[in-house]
Amino acid sequence: MNGLQRNIAHELGHSWFYDSVRNNEFREGWIDEGITSYLASDELLYQDLESYKTEKQYGADGSREYYTKARNEVRSKSEADFLKGLDHCYLNEPWDVVPEGSNAGSKEYSYAPIFLHHAKEIMGEEAFYGFLSEVYRTYTNKVVHSEEILKILRSHNDSKEMNDLIAFYFKEN
């Protein structure tokens, strides 16, 4: 999948997450941008600027090799290792609250897909897509918030491992 195909897939994904299931883009952009970035990516490591630079520099095959290697590194590391130096990365903070050492948009386009990837690893594929399907069915033509998504997520998997993952990525009351 090249950069243009990923962008088209991402934007089509907004037909489900943002057009049908709505959220406050400024306060909780991770919901639509993170979910569509995750779902549109065939290699987990989404369509950020680095992928375009890599593809331009190394060609599509070199880019695929680079991102396959990066994906495998992500899969072999824990959350804390991959997001080194961060004691948390709250996805449910406004767009302009950026984790130290990160760029604007990192939470929404990078960290949110990583959160979803690890949630899927914890839950298993069937339960993960069941969770996303339930979010879609429950909140079509409605506005959804992080708390509601987390409630559905926990209804599919309320393990200590999942709650530790959630604690890293979400500020809860």
Region spans (language model):
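Short pre-active-site segment immediately N-terminal to the catalytic Zn-binding motif
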Residues: M1-A9, V21-G29
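C-terminal, non-catalytic "cap/extension" segments appended to globular domains
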Residues: E125-N173
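Active-site His/Glu-centered metal-binding helix of metallohydrolases
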Residues: I8, L12-F17, I35, L39
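A generic secondary-structure signal for well-formed alpha-helical elements
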Residues: W16-S20, E25, L39-Q47, S51, ...
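Short, conserved alpha-helical segments within structured domains
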Residues: I31-T36, H145, I149
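Acidic/His/Gly-enriched intrinsically disordered linker/tail segments
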Residues: E33, S37-I114, I122, Y139, ...
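Short runs of predominantly hydrophobic/aromatic residues within well-ordered alpha helices
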Residues: A9, A112, E125-F128
